[in-house]
From Swiss-Prot:
Pfam families, alphabetized: Poxv_Bcl-2-like
Subunit-structure text: Interacts with DDX3; this interaction inhibits DDX3 and suppresses DDX3-mediated IFN-beta promoter induction. Interacts with TRAF6 and IRAK2; these interactions suppress TLR-dependent NF-KappaB activation.
Compartments where located: Host cytoplasm
Keywords: Host cytoplasm, Host-virus interaction, Inhibition of host innate immune response by virus, Inhibition of host NF-kappa-B by virus, Inhibition of host RLR pathway by virus, Viral immunoevasion
Gene Ontology biological process terms in this record: symbiont-mediated suppression of host cytoplasmic pattern recognition receptor signaling pathway via inhibition of IRF3 activity; symbiont-mediated suppression of host NF-kappaB cascade; symbiont-mediated suppression of host TRAF-mediated signal transduction
Domain of life: Viruses
Presence of the UniProt keyword Glycosyltransferase in the record: no
Annotated InterPro entries: Orthopox_K7 (IPR009174), Poxvirus_Bcl-2-like (IPR022819), Poxvirus_sf (IPR043018)
UniProt organism field: Vaccinia virus (strain Western Reserve)
Described function: Virulence factor that affects the acute immune response to infection. Bcl-2-like protein which, through its interaction with the DEAD box RNA helicase DDX3X/DDX3, prevents TBK1/IKKepsilon-mediated IRF3 activation. Contributes to virulence by binding to the host TRAF6 and IRAK2 and preventing host NF-kappa-B activation.
Induction pattern: Expressed in the early phase of the viral replicative cycle.
Gene: OPG044
One GO location term (cellular component): host cell cytoplasm
Family stated for the protein in its record: Belongs to the orthopoxvirus OPG044 family.
Protein name: Protein K7
Length: 149
């Protein structure tokens, strides 16, 4: 079990990247990004101190707001903060819902950071492999390649 000190010294491999990683590491990228969103709040880091890749992923917060609406996001974030730590990824069916789901997961772990909950692994929200199907990986890679090139 990792300690808070271990979490504070966590290494984020993609945080400074300005381009998309390989297809094989896209699941690791999303997992790490969601964890990083909590980490920067828990340890009072500068959220803007990152590469273009993470900055592009942060825009998914806006997609989540448009997709779910701010009231629904606040409701989900509060429910997730009170013990219901699972998101049903089967509702992801297109690009917008994929990006909105990534955005809301980031907002949830960020909110946990404000509550001093050091949630160091994204798996507590659900199984990332459920979200990152081959089709969703392709959607995400193509979108990010287009944005970052």
């Amino acid at each position: 079990m990792a300690t808070k000190l271990d979490y504070e010294d966590a290494v984020f491999y993609f945080v400074d990247d300005d381009k998309i990683c390989s297809r094989d590491s896209i699941i690791d990228l999303i997992d790490e990004y969601i964890t990083w969103r909590n980490h920067v709040i828990v340890f009072n880091k500068d959220i803007t101190s990152c590469g273009r890749l993470y900055k592009e992923l942060m825009k998914f917060d806006d997609v989540a707001i448009r997709y779910y609406g701010i009231d629904k996001i606040n409701e989900i974030v509060e429910a997730m903060s009170e013990g219901d730590h699972y998101i049903n990824f089967t509702k992801v069916h297109d690009q917008e819902s994929l990006f909105a789901t990534i955005g809301i997961c980031a907002k949830i772990t960020e909110h946990w950071g404000y509550k001093k909950i050091s949630e160091s692994r994204f798996q507590s929200l659900g199984n990332i492999t459920d979200l990152m199907t081959d089709d969703n990986i392709n959607i995400l890679i193509l979108f990010l390649e287009k944005k970052l090139n």
